[in-house]
């Protein structure tokens, strides 16, 4: 009986140790310092945290125990110090509703943070247009090249907001990335794949810059 109790207590302690208490704040403008493409992910579920993005555990599960709400976000950009998340994700934690439906304003929300792997179904669900892999710009491949091959896909798209380029997959060849259209493929205007931001306080969708 004593051993069983000890093991149970140890399991609870390890579970608590894996979660970190933070305060999350709203972030309106989509961006990615590691070249992840907004048109191929759910940009309403992105994390902008002080730590560097990890391709081993790219997603973060945030739990607001006070209100019983939980949201999973994709960590693909760094911040100067704040734990920012997409405005829509923050609004959901605050109200249980999308920012498009019930836009709110405010400050930090206290949550518990747990990093999760790409194999997690909620993490994969955020990669809406890239077969469950992290979509990265071929012209800025440095971060993606450090990831396991089965974790990323490279595309010949010239900006993280998908304003230029060609929606074609590129292949890793040695220490570089080769695209069917070559480097020039990333420079032309890309139609129909614009990234939207949800405007803070109004809930209106606007084109990301």
Q: Where do the protein language model's features map onto the residues?
A:
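Mature exported/compartmentalized surface modules and terminal targeting/interaction regions
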Residues: 2-58, 71, 78-82, 87-209
